[in-house]
Amino acid sequence: MQTDPRQFLKKALPTMYDLPSEDPEEPGLPDEFHDLQPELLRLTFRPENYSAQEIFVGSDLNLYYDSNQTRWYKRPDWFAVVGVSRLYKKEDLRLSYVVWDEGVSPLIVVELLSPGTENEDLGKTLITGNQGGQPPTKWTVYEQILQIPYYLTFDRYTSQVQAYQLTERGYQPWEAQNQGWWVEEVQMSLGLWEGQYDGIDRLWLRWRDRKQNWILTPEERAEKEKQRADRLAARMRELGIDPNGLDDSAMNDE
């Protein structure tokens, strides 16, 4: 029986354990917003048609994309992959995301514009890859190499969103519908929400469900449940019923 030579090739390629997981010289201006906004996206990315164990969300994580240039990577501010195990090989937290090892490319990437990376994020740089041994730009990687279906940039200073959807002609403007950018594969949309997150009031990017309801964070769900319980307790008191007494009687019945 003949052996498939591709098996040896895959074994020879590095995995996430073999590749660097950080680069202190990576351009961009890390700031508090670059922590909070990706976190809110992560907490609200809850597709109904995928279980939590079939989703991986990365933030400021090395994304290795070329098996012929195994040291080349991009570092998206936020990206999501569906149809892949939450844990690497179903057992370990990821150090990086290595596309040739995982076998699945991201569904969507979000970049938060910074002065040092804005031109590259928006596809305004001239390098297209393999010029003088330089790696290709983010735009080239996302559009041509990985062919990521959805790409979105967000400027925290102007609150401007620039969104693109992959077509046969490459990335084309991705128009908002009902004040959001619909992602068919996960039956959710991205929208701009004005509110308070982590004590900060501003416009944030966050996910909405197919009924256009904002998907709540765990903290928001807990607060909503507390408010519901408080309203119920107040109503019971209006009817002359002590809600605390009900708890005591239930314990005595047990």
Model-based region annotation:
Residues 58-61, 91:
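Short Pro/Gly-enriched beta-strand edge/turn motifs at strand-loop
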Residues 2-30, 35, 47, 65-70, ...:
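C-terminal interaction segment
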